[in-house]
Every structure is written in C-alpha cells, then in structure tokens.
C-alpha cells in the first residue's frame, strides 16, 4: 500500500537506504532538504519503493514542480521498476495537487503510451575501462579541442570553493540569463558546501600555469558508482583555450578504470548534447510527467503566470 507522508513523518534513515541502492544523488534526504526543505513523500511497504513529492502553492493552488539543481526524481525502488508500479505511484499523488510538471528518472520506462509522459536526453559515459580506450572513443572534434587545450599550458586546481564556481557563472553566461535569482544561487552555493562536507561532491577548476585567473570551474556530485557534472562556470578566455574540455577530460582520466558512470547531466540543448557526446558517452532518455486538473479559469491564470516566468 502506498502512503502519503508529510515531511516530519518521513524516516530519513530508511529513505536513504532505498536511495543508496538506486544511486541517484538528487533523491537523498539531505539533498532534498537543501533544494526543497519541506518535501513530502509517497512510500510503499516500509520504504521498499518511494517517490519524493516537491510541491508549491500559487494563487491558492497546490502544484508539483521540479526543484532547481535536480535533473531526475520520480519513483525509486529496491526491486526492478515496472510500468505498473510507476503508474501506481503517479496515481497515488494526492488529489490536492492540481497541476504538475515533474521529471522522473532513467530507470523508469513505459512500454505503452501514458498521457503526460515526455522524454528528455541525458549523456552517460562508462568509466570502467582504461583511459586510453575511453579517449580513443572521443569524437574527432573533441580530440582536436583537447589537443588545443593541452598546448595552452593549463593546469587543474583543487582550491576552488562553491562560491567561486557560482560567481564565475553569474559574471559570465549567467549575466545573460534571468532563469535564477539571488536566492537560487545562494541555495546552490549552500548545496555545494554541504555536499563537499559530506564527501558527496568535489570541486575543480582550471587556470593557466603561472596565472591565477580561473578559466573554468565545476561542481561534481558523487555517489559510490556515479559522478554527476552538476554545475559549471566558464569565462571567455577559458572558452578560447578549451578549458572545459580539459577539465572534463581530467576528471575522466582520474576516474577511469573504476566501476563508475560519468553523468554529464544533459542535455536537451543540441549544442550541449553534441559537446557531451563528443566524449564518447551514450544518449539515455528519461521521462517527465505533466498533468493539469485545473478548471478552465485556473488554466487561464496558469498560462498568464507561465508567460511571465
């Protein structure tokens, strides 16, 4: 039987035991506490299968949404997931939620069409082979860019903190975007700090040897069998020197030969996907789920609100 639990009713020790078997960093209780402090849950059979509920309220309407800095959530199970099991959880979402736009995870598959399901792209690279074999599978353009990077006197630095990564982003590409505000960047910085303290993340940057200017930097989340490229910053000088190609190659090189998957965390953006696929990874699809139970008037208000986002 699937139960709906409020935040205070969740046994986080049991919850995390289930998530550990699934290897998804985003669904750990501490991670959810950082990105959505009052998350709730659907739980079946003493945490044999679980699903986080990340809800909000606008104009008096309860709705579900995907928190920032979380690519995949959905149903997690100690046993292989079936479509029937997934659908039973989706049907168990409390009726108070009138609208939802949430992303599920790559272990969830649908053999037949389900209303509200769409698919998104991720790129994964198996690191359980020697580095030379991995590099041999890089696309030609990636090999050229890496050769250019290696001729640019670059070096890896480990003295980077979350604030440096966020600032590098906000001062460059982030200055052209209005997707996130100060609260979101503060949350990301705090998330990075907590993850590093928990040994669930590492942060690396790239500079030119003898020059202190940070060309690029990134936050990488990690579990026992997965490294996730969560967030990065890159300045124009770094782009010109192929610093990000160098950084990702260094992480791949350091972790090659281990039973680890490198998760590029995206992307539906064609240019980013091409860049990530250039490292020889495989495209993996994961689903999202949308429903709309609003009245006609509510749907009209929602349309206006989404148009302002």
For the regions a protein language model found, what residue spans apply to each?
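Short, solvent-exposed beta-strand edge segments and adjacent coil->beta transition regions
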Residues: 70-72, 151-153, 259
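A gly/proline- and charged-residue-enriched helix-loop-helix capping module
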Residues: 66-107
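Short low-complexity, flexible loop/linker segments enriched in glycine and/or proline
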Residues: 116-117, 173-174, 279, 299-302
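A conserved beta-strand-loop-helix scaffold within acyl/acetyltransferase catalytic domains
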Residues: 2-46, 50-60, 104-239
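Aromatic (often tryptophan-rich) hydrophobic motifs at membrane interfaces
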Residues: 84-91, 193, 198-300
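Short, high-confidence coil segments that cap the C-terminus of an alpha-helix
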Residues: 37-39, 95-99, 257-259
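Short, hydrophobic beta-strand segments that form beta-sheet elements in well-ordered domains
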Residues: 41-43, 98-104, 262-264
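Membrane-proximal basic amphipathic "stem/tether" segments
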Residues: 1, 292-309
């Amino acid at each position: 039987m699937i139960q709906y639990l409020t935040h205070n009713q969740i046994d986080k020790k049991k919850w995390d035991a289930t998530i550990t078997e699934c290897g998804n960093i985003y669904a750990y209780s501490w991670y959810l506490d950082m990105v959505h402090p009052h998350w709730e849950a659907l739980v079946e059979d003493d945490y044999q299968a679980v699903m986080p509920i990340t809800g909000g309220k606008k104009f008096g309407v309860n709705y579900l949404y995907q928190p920032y800095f979380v690519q995949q959530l959905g149903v997690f199970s100690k046993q292989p997931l079936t479509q029937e099991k997934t659908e039973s959880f989706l049907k168990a979402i409390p009726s108070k939620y009138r609208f939802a736009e949430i992303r599920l995870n790559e272990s969830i598959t649908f053999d037949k069409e389900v209303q509200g399901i769409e698919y998104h792209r991720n790129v994964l690279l198996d690191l359980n082979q020697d580095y030379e074999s991995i590099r041999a599978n890089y696309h030609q353009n990636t090999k050229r860019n890496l050769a250019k990077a290696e001729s640019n006197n670059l070096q890896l630095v480990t003295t980077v903190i979350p604030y440096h990564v966020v600032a590098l982003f906000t001062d460059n590409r982030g200055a052209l975007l209005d997707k996130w505000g100060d609260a979101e960047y503060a949350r990301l910085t705090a998330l990075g700090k907590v993850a590093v303290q928990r040994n669930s993340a590492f942060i690396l940057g790239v500079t030119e040897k003898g020059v202190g200017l940070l060309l690029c930097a990134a936050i990488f989340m990690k579990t026992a069998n997965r490294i996730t490229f969560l967030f990065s910053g890159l300045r124009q000088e770094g782009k010109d020197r192929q610093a990000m190609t160098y950084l990702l190659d260094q992480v791949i090189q350091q972790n090659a030969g281990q039973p680890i998957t490198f998760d590029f965390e995206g992307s539906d953006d064609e240019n980013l996907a091409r860049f990530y696929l250039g490292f020889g990874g495989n495209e993996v699809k994961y689903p999202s789920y949308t429903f709309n139970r609003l009245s006609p008037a509510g749907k009209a208000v929602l349309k206006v609100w989404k148009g302002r986002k």
